[in-house]
Amino acid sequence: MKYFSFSFFLFAISPMVLADNLTQSFQQSKQQFNEFQSLNQNRWIQQHSFQFITQQPKNDSLSKACLNYQGIQFKGVTLVKADHLLPKKEECINEERLNQLSQQLTQEYIDKGYIHNPFQFEDDHSGLLTLHVFEGKTAALESDDKQLNLNQLLPNVLGTPLKVQDLDQALDQANRISGNNVTVDVLPAKNGEIRLSFSNELTSRISGSIGIDDRASKNYGRWQARAAVNIGNPFGLSDTLYLSGAHTLKSRYQFNRSLLLHYSLPYGYWTFSSFASFSQFKSPLILENFSLQQNGRTVQAGISAEYVFHRGGNHISTFSTQFEKLNSKNRLEDVVLALQSPKLSSISVGINHLQLFENGNLVVDLRYEQGNNRGQEQPESQFKRSNLELKFNRYQALDSELFRHSHQLTGQYASHYLPSVKQEDLTGYNRVRGLNDLNLSAEKNLISHNDIAWIKQTKIGTFSPYLGFDLGIQKSVNEDQREKALAYAIGLNWSYKAFQANLEWATGRLFDKSDGVKQERFISTNFVYLF
């Protein structure tokens, strides 16, 4: 196989021009992976609602007359520290004080996550009143769905005190599976123990979508077809299998296509995943007097582990680590372009936090990646980068109308050269809109993507007209060049049963010191059928 960077024959061709198609091809794979992550996040948000703090009602009918007890003692209390709740010496013990003690002790257990701890008062006529707590331990797991693998969802829970975090985590893992709608009843057993009875209103194990849009590059004729399939519990391990693909529709001689396969396996607070993606393109490179055929492909595979290290009624925080390998090969005719053919291996760590509010939600994602580049004739053999993503959605009611504010902030920082497949995009549908044919990416960038939508329910579906505004800035480490971009857009989303559609008109402007101001307008459409 012949390798070269640029011969005299191609001296006038910019390396960025040669890299554009490879970058566009890999963008398709990145978009599929981002859609999969957004699908899981949105599913979690839809299944949870903001939990308000409830106040215990005050009972004014309780007697304040002192009872004939010298004090109170606890029995069976091992999971919380509660001695500070006991009445002080010579304090009046009455019905009101006993009710207060019961509520305070219950709250101590709830604050620690223990939700089933029945108790009773016992009088042995010694002058001390005993508050006997039966700390609920899990005695049995039951389910009306034999395909629900409870050992994967609640490992090592039998014989241990039940925590609400364990139960919430198990329900989250179960309801990530396509077609599942799992609920649980906490039922009493013997000696204060409990049994957990799971119920599943199963629909279909297979779900997915088929769609078409015109958001591909002009070079590929705009139109592309997309499809995704989500298979729940394929191996009976409460696991999920996700497959998605996209293909431009111009011709078989000039195309961009990609495929993503993702598999995840839950185990309590852990989720283990593996994935593989493939992207490929073919396109002519038009020169002044002739044209050359450019083609390339990128193969990516990896494994990851995610651990939920903290969760509450309105939030969930996870730590994740991922190892991946990526191999790109870009050819001009039968010659491999070494600079645009990196071979990468990397490891990354990240923290994700998802927070619910009364009328909105926030997603924070921080990630650091470090890796090696073993491709030939690469500028640097190692790379490092840090990424930030913030998503905030808020619903606001004005009189009888409902509005949604959607804001996304993404950023990347790298102090040294990054291969093009690891650079972040400045332009695109989910970045700065309207500039779809300007493929701009760099090591450092910051982008704000914003929409305000009016949500209107009608007999023929939900209509959401919206206004959009984007801002972005990027800088390359190899060139003293900085680009700025802004865009404004107007669009309409529509959904009815299994059908979804989008129409958007966007204007983007690029500010460059060397080339001045460039402006593009882009009208895009998207049609999706869900099954």
Task: Describe the residue ranges of each PLM region.
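Gram-negative/organellar outer-membrane beta-barrel architecture
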Residues: V164-L171, N175-G360, K518-L530
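Predominantly the C-terminal beta-signal and adjacent terminal strand-loop region
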Residues: S495-F531
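Sec-dependent signal peptide recognition
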Residues: K2-L10
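Transmembrane beta-barrel strands of outer-membrane/channel proteins
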Residues: V186, I210-D214, A227, L241-H247, ...
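Periplasmic polypeptide-binding modules associated with outer-membrane biogenesis and secretion
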Residues: D20-A216, A246-R257, L409
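C-terminal outer-membrane beta-barrel translocator/porin domains of Gram-negative envelope proteins
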Residues: R331, L337-F469, K475-V477, F511-G516, ...
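Short glycine-rich, acidic/polar surface loops and turns
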Residues: D451, V477, A485-N493
